[in-house]
Amino acid sequence: MKKSIVVLFSAVLPFAVFADDAKELVSKLDVMQGIKANFSQKVTDQNGKLIQEGSGVIAMHQPDAFYWHLTAPDESLIVAKDNSVWVYNPFAEEVSILDMEDILKASPMALLVHRDEKRWNEYQIDRKGSCFDITPRQGVESAVDTVSVCFANNTLSDIRLTDAQGSTSHFSLSEQAAVTDADESLFQFQIPDGVSIDDQRRQ
């Protein structure tokens, strides 16, 4: 479970520390600040064979706020805020709680909402058309080989994650809108009554 959460995850910093492609990505994220959208997901194996399809809602807001609600085929929920990440499986009636730091170490996806110069410098960023590939530099451990984020003008439109086994998760976004004050409750996870709690945070 923890590995799948790490694969799913991925700032705005002083421009002086970035190469040109990274500067441009940071600028687009700076303009965006926060986004809420519906998504459709397709997961394919290394041979391009479709493994799974899904849909749900995603929201991101800087700094360090992330919401991912898979509604089909099976419901699951991930909420990240500040230093903690909550992973809720309604079918299993279980909540796992992780340190945000563990997610940041393992996935470039977290860069989209995190302000950490050290983390940004661990990744190579290359523009390819309207997309930006985020790749761990040599020696950086990551469950994800590449995260590609694509924009239509200044609106985030697609996220593609490729893992070490060659599997690809493609999230196509629709009905994008700015995060408003009314959406802030998305990032405040309330643990349901009666569920099992697996708190893996370092105290």
Swiss-Prot record:
Keyword tags: Chaperone, Periplasm, Protein transport, Signal, Transport
Main localization (coarse): periplasm
SUPFAM superfamilies cross-referenced by the UniProt entry: Prokaryotic lipoproteins and lipoprotein localization factors
GO cellular component labels: outer membrane-bounded periplasmic space
The keyword Nucleotidyltransferase belongs to this UniProt entry's keyword annotation: no
Record carries keyword Signal: yes
Subcellular localization, as worded in the UniProt entry: Periplasm
An example Gene Ontology biological process: lipoprotein localization to outer membrane
Signal peptide feature range: 1-19
Functional description taken from the UniProt entry: Participates in the translocation of lipoproteins from the inner membrane to the outer membrane. Only forms a complex with a lipoprotein if the residue after the N-terminal Cys is not an aspartate (The Asp acts as a targeting signal to indicate that the lipoprotein should stay in the inner membrane).
Family: Belongs to the LolA family.
HAMAP family: LolA (MF_00240)
Subunit composition and interactions: Monomer.
Database matches in NCBIfam families: lolA
Name this protein carries in UniProt: Outer-membrane lipoprotein carrier protein
Originating organism: Shewanella amazonensis (strain ATCC BAA-1098 / SB2B)
Lineage, opening ranks: Bacteria, Pseudomonadati, Pseudomonadota, Gammaproteobacteria, Alteromonadales
Gene giving rise to this polypeptide: lolA
